[in-house]
Amino acid sequence: MAQVDFIETTLGELVGAAQAYKAKGWRFAQCCASRNGDDAFELLYSFVDDATNEVANLRVCVTSADEIPSVGGIYPVAFMFENEIHDLYGLTVVDMNLDYRGGFYHLHIPAPMAQAPQGKAKPVAAAKPAAAAE
């Protein structure tokens, strides 16, 4: 069974950690964000060693005021994930190798995932069967 690690890190350590994984031959698998409070977000960067199937997840906690350094200079494919984080969460990623400047997704609401939930969802009424033909 593959080992999966979750490692707490900081914005200041993020680029150096990505460089270390690149130097060891690990691939960048993904980066995602989640809203973790009123102005708190969690970023998760995943790296994989294909030889051993080991996975390392770097966890970084940020606020909307933070500037997130891009790892795109190390792993060029990161531009997709970083643009997604910017567009969906409104977070600032600096020094992206390909910056869509908010146009990666065409959204009706700016940064929809950064918005606080608007209350409990209302249940959808069950569909009523159509009346039988006479």
Describe each PLM feature range.
Residues 1-134:
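Terminal low-complexity/charged segments
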